Amino acid sequence: CLVLAPKNAWDEVRKFGGDHNYVMFNRRTLFSYGDITFYSVRAQHSDLEAVGVIISAEGKNYYITGDTLYNDEIFADINRDIDVIFVPINGVGNNMNIKDAALFAKKTGAKTAVPVHWGMFDSIDPNGFDFENKVIPEVYKEIVF
């Protein structure tokens, strides 16, 4: 089992032991696993070591922002074209709100955006996420890109 985690989380998850590959995955770390590459990018969160991840596989780049606020400094870490971005929209707990998330997704140049972190601590309707090519996830339904 592969476990990628920034330093503070890495220190904790290693305590679980087991036959796992625990990789310290701090900002701007690149890690390849077979034909898949993982690249960590800055996230703006209360946890200063928080990161997002760009996963590259089968010729596509998927950017999972993780918990983050909109911060222009993040864009300096995005060093490849983004096919799909997964972005929080709930505006709670240092996550972007729906408006900022749409602006952020557009600025990355992503072809498709998937709003996440809605319906947790809020009553946000993800259909209000202003992005031309968006995919609204449904519970227990696979998304194919």
Where do the language-model regions lie?
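Active-site HxH/HxHxD metal-binding segment of metal-dependent hydrolases
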Residues: 1-31
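Active-site neighborhood of phospho(di)ester-bond hydrolases with catalytic His/Asp-centered motifs
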Residues: 3-7, 62-67, 85-90, 113-117, ...
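Loop/helix-junction capping segments adjacent to catalytic residues or to phosphate/diphosphate-binding pockets
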Residues: 72, 94-96, 121-123
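Binuclear metal-ion centers of metallo-dependent hydrolases, dominated by the metallo-beta-lactamase
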Residues: 17, 23-28, 76, 100-145
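Active-site-proximal segments of metal-dependent phosphoesterases and phosphodiesterases across multiple
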Residues: 47, 84-106
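Core dinuclear metal-dependent hydrolase active-site scaffold
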Residues: 23-80, 93, 139-145
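Active-site metal-binding motif and surrounding structural segment of the metallo-beta-lactamase
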Residues: 1-5, 12, 80-86, 109
